[in-house]
From Swiss-Prot:
<dbReference type="Pfam" id="PF06024">
    <property type="entry name" value="Orf78"/>
</dbReference>
<dbReference type="InterPro" id="IPR009261">
    <property type="entry name" value="AcMNPV_AC78"/>
</dbReference>
<protein>
    <recommendedName>
        <fullName>Uncharacterized 11.7 kDa protein</fullName>
    </recommendedName>
</protein>
Amino acid sequence: MNLDVPYYRLGAHERVEYIPLKLALNDDAPPPAAHEYAEARAAGGEAAPPAEQWSAGVIVLIGLVAFVALFLLLYVIYYFVILRDQPQYSDDIDNDPPFAFNKFD
């Protein structure tokens, strides 16, 4: 099989097992220079924290949000379910409407 066939001439009936990458001149990556990391860190400044500290901060933030959401959920259940089931009495009985309306009054 000839591998130098241009892509536009390959038909649907031909099976391609390998397409060479003609732009890749060298498969070996060059070793990074020792000063690249220092230059990138100096250019970026110290404002960007390392990935370990950033991920720990995200975990703490998610924990706080989960705690607040759980607290709000329990408060809503307490307010709308537990407090609403209890009878509520008033100190001023004269201003409250009667519980049972009598049509013969």
